[in-house]
């Protein structure tokens, strides 16, 4: 136990807060805390309960600040950012925040975190459900027998893009018996060398020099896109149903929907996947991954300034899980 938790444990107010959580008397609240005080209370609760935290903040700036404060007190604190939804085809659209989010979701699904801090707008955005993420996640080890072609199919299904040579995240390249993969969350790509169908060696390597930097025994390959069409035919039919429901003068919209349905059948994917996200997943967003304490900082501001605005944009999800702590 840290010295900060030790001091807080001597406080009657904190003891009452901790007792309320333990006995299930929720929601509970703590008022009058400074920004640093919020981090200290959350850290002390984590140490007492030994359960991970999901903390919602009003905006990105407050999320970044709280993440930094918590990281000085405990390890494996993750920041879950909001991302810009792409509803039209945009050349060269950045996927930086999407990849950051996928890394956080993968670590939450694996239980490899102590706290996740998220602006409420980010937490309310639809995303891949845990079951789908785990189904698309694969771990390979040195000595495994797996045909390279089979692994390539799994990578494509998980949203990776094939290149002649890997030069960025979410890419892979296959040359003979060598398979290079750059999963989200890693700082360097990984090279798998095969002897037939057996993984003979596995090493991280530098993108610029192509030199090996670290020998690995295993690699966890996680999805590289939040929207994956597991059943392209089913989604195509749902898009066609939307088109059939359009009436009046919505000719162009109907044509666009039918074109997307046709392209999805032919290629298995679409360049503007986000607009069909509600057809692909039944999701409560980040809340589906929460199995510990849910805390809200500045709860009144979160509700007024963010949730209403997100609802107006049609991006918010309905969550029945009760807030357990308001600070």
Which residues are covered by each model-predicted region?
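ASCE RecA-like P-loop NTPase motor cores
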Residues: 1-327
